[in-house]
Amino acid sequence: MFQGETAITVDDKGRMAVPTAYRDLVARASNNRLVLTYNPFEAGCLWLYAESEWERVRDDVMSKPNTQRVVRLLQQKLVGSAAHLELDGNGRISIPASHRGAVGIEKKAVLLGMGDKFELWSEQAHRALIQQTLSDEDLGDGLLDLKL
């Protein structure tokens, strides 16, 4: 399970180091293979899955009938735009320029461990995310009983 926040540096070739704390987990879960795709819900963010978890997500998304525009858009953003990546000998992955450009990732990024996946945020989008607050209305009835 992935959790925590890590400041990431992206080099001129678009490579970033996966934090050492996660490398063994990624190696065991998916033989050093990850899948990168767009976060369909929030701008400035990419999702990064271990390949084994990605296969479950991909199959679930593609099992939905694409007769609705929202389903097609979800399939396009998640599956159609997915990039398969492999950790190199130094624990780095290369983020495609198309993905970096689309979400505004340049030299600095933030990696969030989100349980079954990572979120890779541009530094600016992450700063805006952290500055947002939640109200009781945002939580809704199902979350009001959380004990945080």
Swiss-Prot record:
<dbReference type="InterPro" id="IPR038619">
    <property type="entry name" value="MraZ_sf"/>
</dbReference>
<dbReference type="GO" id="GO:0000976">
    <property type="term" value="F:transcription cis-regulatory region binding"/>
</dbReference>
<dbReference type="Pfam" id="PF02381">
    <property type="entry name" value="MraZ"/>
</dbReference>
<protein>
    <recommendedName>
        <fullName>Transcriptional regulator MraZ</fullName>
    </recommendedName>
</protein>
<dbReference type="InterPro" id="IPR035644">
    <property type="entry name" value="MraZ_C"/>
</dbReference>
<dbReference type="GO" id="GO:0003700">
    <property type="term" value="F:DNA-binding transcription factor activity"/>
</dbReference>
<dbReference type="GO" id="GO:0005737">
    <property type="term" value="C:cytoplasm"/>
</dbReference>
<dbReference type="InterPro" id="IPR035642">
    <property type="entry name" value="MraZ_N"/>
</dbReference>
<comment type="similarity">
    <text>Belongs to the MraZ family.</text>
</comment>
<dbReference type="GO" id="GO:2000143">
    <property type="term" value="P:negative regulation of DNA-templated transcription initiation"/>
</dbReference>
<keyword id="KW-0963">Cytoplasm</keyword>
<dbReference type="GO" id="GO:0009295">
    <property type="term" value="C:nucleoid"/>
</dbReference>
<keyword id="KW-0238">DNA-binding</keyword>
<dbReference type="InterPro" id="IPR020603">
    <property type="entry name" value="MraZ_dom"/>
</dbReference>
<comment type="subunit">
    <text>Forms oligomers.</text>
</comment>
<feature type="domain" description="SpoVT-AbrB 2">
    <location>
        <begin position="82"/>
        <end position="125"/>
    </location>
</feature>
<keyword id="KW-0804">Transcription</keyword>
<dbReference type="InterPro" id="IPR037914">
    <property type="entry name" value="SpoVT-AbrB_sf"/>
</dbReference>
<feature type="domain" description="SpoVT-AbrB 1">
    <location>
        <begin position="5"/>
        <end position="53"/>
    </location>
</feature>
<keyword id="KW-0805">Transcription regulation</keyword>
<dbReference type="InterPro" id="IPR003444">
    <property type="entry name" value="MraZ"/>
</dbReference>
<dbReference type="InterPro" id="IPR007159">
    <property type="entry name" value="SpoVT-AbrB_dom"/>
</dbReference>
<keyword id="KW-0677">Repeat</keyword>
